[in-house]
Amino acid sequence: MGKVIGIDLGTTNSCVAVMEGTQPKVIENAEGARTTPSIVAFTDDGERLVGQPAKRQAVTNPSRTFFAIKRLIGRTYDDPMTQKDKGLVPYAITRAGNGDAWVAADGKQFSPSQISAFTLQKMKETAESYLGQPVTQAVITVPAYFNDAQRQATKDAGKIAGLEVLRIINEPTAAALAYGLDKRKSGVIAVYDLGGGTFDVSILEIGDGVFEVKSTNGDTFLGGEDFDNRIVEYLAAEFKREQGIDLTKDKLALQRLKEAAEKAKIELSSATQTEINLPYITADASGPKHLALKLSRAKFESLVDDLIQRTIEPCRKALKDAGVSANEIDEVVLVGGMTRMPKIQDVVKTFFGKEPHKGVNPDEVVAIGAAVQAGVLQGDVKDVLLLDVTPLSLGIETLGGVFTRLIDRNTTIPTKKSQVFSTAEDNQNAVTIRVFQGEREMAADNKLLGQFDLVGIPPAPRGVPQIEVTFDIDANGIVNVTAKDKATGKEHQIRIQASGGLSETEIQRMVQEAEANAAEDKKRRELVEVKNQGESLIHATEKSVKEYGDKVSEADKAGITTAIDALRQALAGEDVETIKARTTDLMQASMKLGEAMYAASQGAGPEAGADQAQAKKDDVIDADFQEVDDKDQKKRA
């Protein structure tokens, strides 16, 4: 069995770790960084870029650079959050045939799972490069407040990337695993996780290697991206006030504002003021325009105060559900890059009444926890038991559109619960089971996970048939539902796949595309390498012809020129084999030149060689040594 890796698939950045013996290790990527931007881009010629290379070109290619894609995963196009996101990103968000939110570039649609898979592939390659062996299994983290559709879509992303996802683990729980691995003390901890796109808070009880989640709460559309957007809105408003030009209508300018906003936000965690300079941000009839302004930490805090306050209500709910008060929390662990912001640390300190623990790296702790869980599943990590919970209540729609709960939120998973229902009308021979997830009293106000029909119910007065509905939630938080007619024993089981979601056929198609893309990337790399080799050979040969051309016959020189022209022509194309063949031809043609160069370096023959040797002999000078007393030398110095 190969190594199982732990991956934190983040909104802004992703990270991969692995267990080395009893210690988790974060793996650096090809660029030497410990985290990788969760950004995927497609260039003019169709090349796919992932991570830092994609981020670097975002300003000049905004409509084909996909970032914060995690905010769309498992969401429908009509979801209010999707519609909100449409106004915030420069790329196209489109409606897929199944009603899901997908993204598009150059007329081609991609599911968020597919884009996420490209990032996961990069993580997989990073691990394989470090371990020196293929990696096929992983533990992937998700926000604790992700619903079933979002969890399933994340699992699909892993499958598309060529990974068997052994476990989906909640981010705050992973952070708690990393935090508590080496600590033998017991107690109640709160994990406050504010990342790039999502917010979670979990209350856990730790003791004797048991990590028991008591409650979880959060907001899957609150994170660093929103903080960046507040700065972008402020910069655009200030520029419009001064120059009368609306930068939000210009995709390129908007991308530059976004990059500047992220940089300013990071700087304001350590500095009290930062300067934003964006020369040539736009132009009008009067000429180019530049943006230059100072942003203080106090101003930034006022711009985002409501966002920070939005994290407090989930904290209150989590404490209430766990049945503990803030002063009963022994330690508050901060996770996610946004928790570096001093104001957030102050708010957390005020709410919980204690200084938050800053001993973990907020960008890496989740991946480390995922690696620990991978180690548990692999048998490398002993005496660790993880008990997680389902974040949202699960139930079905019953008469009058009421949401009838079968499993309450914060129930420890895996879990199974059954309840018997009946028909609403006389002689009803089929029932539609509509499965929802959420906390509202009416089914329509909650998230529809999926629906199915149980048919062939024998005719009977209403209320007589007994239909047993069973909910089964696995350790990944993914739901299976069974409906059984107790009279006939007829059963219908579905693994919840939202009315949207990817079908098995679509997943297989995307897996094949990912494999084809990997092959295409390899071909592209090979093309670049043979082109570089060909161009280097032309340069070296032309230089040699200038220096030693008079040492070879005109016929040989003509042959070299013809071979250079043929290779140049091949380099203008994309055929690797042709370039290789023409490169070999040029190497053959220039062999005579090589012989001439070798002869020239040997001199004009044996006599010249002998003369040179004699000259060298005559040049030898006898050394005249003089002994210097060490003490004497020191005195002179």
Curated annotation (Swiss-Prot):
Ranges of compositional bias, category Acidic residues: 621-630
Keyword list, A-Z: ATP-binding, Chaperone, Nucleotide-binding, Phosphoprotein, Stress response
SUPFAM superfamilies (UniProt xref): Actin-like ATPase domain, Heat shock protein 70kD (HSP70), C-terminal subdomain, Heat shock protein 70kD (HSP70), peptide-binding domain
Transmembrane segments: none
Listed InterPro entries: ATPase_NBD, Chaperone_DnaK, Heat_shock_70_CS, HSP70_C_sf, HSP70_peptide-bd_sf, Hsp_70_fam
Any one GO molecular function term: unfolded protein binding
Pfam families hit by this protein: HSP70 (PF00012)
Region (Disordered) residue spans: 600-637
The UniProt record lists the keyword GTP-binding: no
Residue positions where Phosphothreonine is found in the record: 198
Upregulation: By stress conditions e.g. heat shock.
Similarity comment: Belongs to the heat shock protein 70 family.
NCBIfam families (UniProt xref): PRK00290.1, PRK05183.1, prok_dnaK
Protein role: Acts as a chaperone.
HAMAP family found in the cross-reference section: DnaK
Listed name of the protein: Chaperone protein DnaK
Originating species: Methylobacterium nodulans (strain LMG 21967 / CNCM I-2342 / ORS 2060)
